[in-house]
Structure formats: C-alpha cells, structure tokens
C-alpha cells in the first residue's frame, strides 16, 4: 500500500516510547497514467510508500519534545538477480567452451554489483536476517546476528594482513571474503585460512 502501516507504527512509538518494527511489502505496481501521483512523479505505488514514510518520519521527529528521540529509519529491498556470475555447464566434449566459461568465472562477481548488494545477498545465503545490525569500519562490513549475538565480518573491499589481524581481534564467528581481493596472492590466502582455523573462526572465500 502507501505506507500507512509504517506511519502508524512510528507514530505509536513516538507516543508511548515503544520500539516496534514494521515490514511493508509492495509489488512494483504502476500508478495510473492520469493520476495525481503520476503527475507528481510517482511511477509506482512503492515510490509513493517510500516518500510517505520519509515525510512521516520527518514530521514525527520534528514533533518530538524534551529532546526525545526515536528511530524512524527504514531500509528498502528489491528482488533482483544474483550479484554473482552463474556457471553455465558446457557440453562435455566442448573443451573450448569449458575454457571460456572458466575464464569468465575467474572473478565470480558481476562488475556492476555494489558491495552493499553483495553483502545482503551473502547475509541471506548464511541465514542472517535482513534486520541484523550492520556497521562499516575500515573497509569491513560487520553484521551482528540479533538471535545469537554472533559477529560476522565481510571483506568486500580489500584484503591485506593488517586488515585480517584487525578483524580477528574482534573475535567474529565467521569471516567471508571475495576471492578476487587476494589478487592471486596464494601465500596471503593460505595464511588467512590458517589464521582463521587457529582462531576457531569459520572462513569462506566467495
């Protein structure tokens, strides 16, 4: 819909100091071409909902008294194709096609995929909720599992020995890194695997 549920939840939290959450689901349904919404620049109902939530957030925050604060932030997710390349199995007898496919998958990430999109896709693969607390520090995404309290680290920007040491110091339960970030440095990759194992940290290279 147009975000009425989100508006009501934020308003109620402002009134009684609650910390309720909301989830709104909307198909990308287009607005009527002759509607006032379309004239105002809203091509889909989802766009209307997002703008309503933004305006409601500002209105509610501006109306708070005595320095009170509530969290009126929200995230927007859209269904999309994977950010990782999909392996296409060639015919067994076609060695040239197999070689081409191997070359294409040296880097498993699609070039146009953002780090944030990769992060949330990997979170879903690992069974982490989209509502988990996410922070970004020193080129590392940290995700706190709201159910177990476990810390997950995602290396999606760069990898070097100093960064590995800094991540391990935070005692995560699991670390995931993009394979391409090792840039063919097998020694660094092997040392990383050994360090993670010695520290009792699960490690995944993607």
Each predicted region: which residue ranges?
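Walker A/P-loop
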Residues: 1-8
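Accessory, often C-terminal, charged low-complexity segments
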Residues: 11-206
């Amino acid at each position: 819909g147009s975000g009425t549920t989100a508006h009501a939840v934020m308003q109620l939290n402002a009134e009684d100091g609650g910390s309720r959450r909301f989830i709104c689901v909307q198909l990308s349904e287009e607005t009527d071409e002759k509607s006032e919404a379309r004239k105002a620049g809203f091509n889909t109902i989802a766009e209307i909902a997002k703008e309503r939530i933004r305006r409601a957030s500002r209105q509610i925050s501006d109306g708070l008294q005595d320095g009170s604060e509530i969290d009126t932030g929200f995230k927007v997710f859209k269904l999309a194709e994977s950010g990782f390349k999909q392996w296409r199995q060639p015919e067994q007898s076609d060695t040239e096609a197999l070689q081409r496919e191997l070359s294409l998958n040296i880097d498993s990430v699609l070039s146009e995929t953002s780090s944030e999109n990769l992060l949330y896709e990997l979170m879903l693969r690992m069974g982490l909720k989209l509502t988990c607390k996410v922070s970004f520090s020193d080129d590392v995404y940290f995700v706190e599992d709201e159910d177990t309290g476990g810390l997950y680290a995602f290396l999606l920007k760069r990898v070097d020995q100093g960064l590995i040491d800094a991540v391990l110091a935070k005692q995560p339960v699991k670390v995931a890194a993009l394979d391409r970030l090792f840039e063919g440095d097998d020694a660094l990759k092997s040392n990383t695997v050994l360090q993670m194992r010695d520290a009792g940290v699960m490690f995944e290279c993607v």
